[in-house]
Each structure stands twice: as structure tokens, then as C-alpha cells.
Amino acid sequence: MQHGDEMMKKMTGKSFALSALVAASFMAAGAMASDKTEPRNEVYKDKFANQYNSWHDTAKSEEITDALAGDPSLVILWAGYGFAKDYNAPRGHMYAVTDVRNTLRTGAPANAEDGPMPMACWSCKSPDVPRLIEEQGEEGYFKGKWAKGGPEVVNTIGCSDCHEKGTPKLRISRPFAERAMETIGTPFDKASKKDKQSMVCGQCHVEYYFEKKDDRKGFVKFPWDSGTTVEQMEAYYDAIEFSDWTHALSKTPMLKAQHPGYETWKLGVHGKNDVSCVDCHMPKVTNDKGRKYTDHKVGNPFDRFDETCATCHSQSKEFLEGITKERYAKVKELKARAEGQLVKAHFEAAKAWEVGATEAEMKPILTDIRHAQWRWDFAIASHGVAAHAPEEALRILGTAVDKAADARVKLAQLLAKKGVTDAVAIPDISTKAKAQAALGMDMDKMNAEKEAFKKDVLPKWDEEAKKREATYK
């Protein structure tokens, strides 16, 4: 006992607090995973076999599509931000944790206090997130760097993200999402079953940002205080003078849209007619014993046409697919026009700074660029918008083109005033590698650091998680 007292005295206050925290967490874990959340999806594979097996089939979307390689302009549009390093098309829920670990955007942290990203980057990736919030509170969960959560957030998006523990009953598992629904006058506990089916998806398939206020630094918040349209959120961000980053070329205080699928779905024909996300992406199907269940392989409705589209539409699959492809082509065309204007605007703004433009002269120009790119990003980041709300997508992209053009007209006038009358040269950005090189990005170094991280750090995270989960009852 005396020896123990001496050891205690030698421990610093910081190390003692850390030891106490670890001990407390293991004591809690020894009781059960969490009172409200069982993060281990495999626990439910027998009780809810059909749902579990179909959920597991989301692993079949194993192909990785490099969005930057497919559209190198994105590198320039996101210059100075993590997405210029690496951005792949989204895959199935089974890959949520894997992909956020592997992306260059999360860096190659050497320890829990290292790396470029905050803890909030885990927030939509795993049922371990609500578990941690229940154990630590939001203040404890959001505090610190992304790497802090590495050994804790290991179970991919699954059962407890959307369901109450051990039951099919739907729930919102993130307090920040619950607050957001209340903000727009649709509290989850008062919603219909049909609305709840979309609201659980709206925990993550939404626009959000990380707060910068001292008392809530790094907290996730949905910018819905003034409404959920692109203009209302833009006005909200402007009012609080928020920006995600400063553009490396134009020095514009930029906004990065996330994936506002819920907001755009609400504005489309399906949302307005009470057709939920589940109706189209998780339909009722019949197993080999003739029993119906909800298919949890979230995917393209056309892959299960008879159980999805055909329950409402009398037209053929070929007809509806044709219409959707036409709409997608129109959205893609306007998207490209907006990108072309924005890329030139960023380079022209960089030139204006170079030849002596003042902040006062640049402010209205940067506002136009900020608003144009926000609107472009909002439309394209809303995956499936060509099916959900094509008219809204085209409207938003049209305003993006207009605002980018406005910025370029002002830039032409300002550049002429500064003596620049020739067109501003745009470097070769025809490939992802050339675009990244034009920005001076050392991709070899970033990739090497990431590979070392995957080799040296990830196995340690998994081993720590395995030991912790072994104490669960």
C-alpha cells in the first residue's frame, strides 16, 4: 500500500487524469458496450439475419472511383483544402471507416494529438460515435484531433446508427442531428413513421459544418437556422462570417458543401409527395421463405425496379432510366460550365492580387466567387440530385454560372485598371497530377506518409479496439 502511495505521488496530474479516464472507460465497457448503443453490427446477424446480410452486401461496391482524376478542375476549385489532395466517389456503408482512414484528407497522424483533421470527421462514419457521445458527452467527444478516435471508431455505419438498441425502432442517434430537426420545426419524436424513415438518413446525408466558437469548437452543426435552401444557408454562413478555408489562389473565404441530399430531396417531386429515402433505396423485399423485410443494401432504385419505382410508376424501367439519364446529362453540362468559369475566376483573382489589388477592391469579387462556388458545390455534392430534384439542381447551377461570370467581369475591369489587358494564363490542368503540380502539391510525400501510417498506425488502432471490445458483455 505504501509503495502504491509513492507511485501515485510520482504521477503528474495530467497522467493521473489520463489513467483515470482510461480506467473509467474500461469499467464502463466491461458492463456493456453502452446503455443505448451496441456498436458491433455483427451482434445482430442472427436476430435480424435478413437485414444484416443485405446490409453486409453494401461491401459489393468495392470499386474505388477517383473523382479528381475524372475531373481535374476539382483540384483547382479546392486549392488549399483537403479535397484537392484526394476525393473518391462514395461507396457503400461497409466502407465508411475504411475510406476515411485511407483518404489523404485525414493525413498521416503519428499520435492522438497529430494530424490535420478534428474528431468531428468521424461523426457520420460509425455507431461508435453515438456510443462515445453517450460515454463522454458531446464536449468530450468533439475535443481533439481525428486521430484520437482511431482506436475507438472501428465499426462501420450500421444497425445502431438508425435503430434503438436491439429493436427495429428508428432513432436519431446524433444529438446534433436531433437539434437540427427541431430547428426546422420537425422534431423526430413528433414525426410520422414515413418522415422518420428519411430523417434517420438526414442525420448524415446533409450539409453541416464544424463550429469555431470557443465554447463549441469542433462541434458538428447543420446550418439550418434560417432554413434549408441553398440561399438560406448561404445567408446564414455570411451572417456568422464562416468559412471552411481560404482558397490558395484567389484568397476567397470559401464554403465547402458536404452532401445535402436531405435538403435537396425535400425540394424534389419525391420529397414533396412523401416518398421517403427508404421507399426508393431500401425497399421491402421477400426472402426465400416468403417473408418480407427491409433490404438494407442501400443502392440505386433501378437495381430493384419492381420493388421501388414500379410501386408508383406505370412507365417501364427503360423509359424512367432514359429520363433520369437525360436529366443527369443536363446537370453535368451546367456543372462543367460553372467549373470552367470558377477555375478562370480563381486564377484571375490571383493575378489581381499579384498586380496590387487591395482588399477593398477584391471584396465584392471574392463574395461573388464564394457564392458561386458554394452553389456549384451544393448542387454537385448532393449525390443523386439528378433524380431527387433536377430542376433545383439546374436552377442552383445556373445561379453559380451567373455569379462566377459576375466575378470575372469585375476582375476584367480591375485588371485593366491595373494595366493587365491580356488574358490571364491558365496552366495545364488537364490531369489530376498536372493540376496538383500547378498548385505545388508534393503528392509523392503525402502518399508515402499515408502508406507508412496505414502500415504502422492502423494495426495498433485495431489491436486497441479488439482489446476494448473483448471486455464488452
From Swiss-Prot:
Signal sequence, start to end: 1-33
Positions that bind substrate: Y208, H259
InterPro entries, sorted: Cyt_c552, Cyt_c_NO2Rdtase_formate-dep, Multihaem_cyt_sf
EC numbers for this chain: 1.7.2.2
Keyword match Transport: yes
Pathway the protein takes part in: Nitrogen metabolism; nitrate reduction (assimilation)
Record: residues binding heme c 3: H93, C201, C204, H205
UniProt family annotation: Belongs to the cytochrome c-552 family.
Entries under NCBIfam families matching the protein: cyto_c552_HCOOH, PRK11125.1
The protein, known as: Cytochrome c-552
Organism this protein belongs to: Shewanella sp. (strain ANA-3)
Classification lineage: Bacteria, Pseudomonadati, Pseudomonadota, Gammaproteobacteria, Alteromonadales
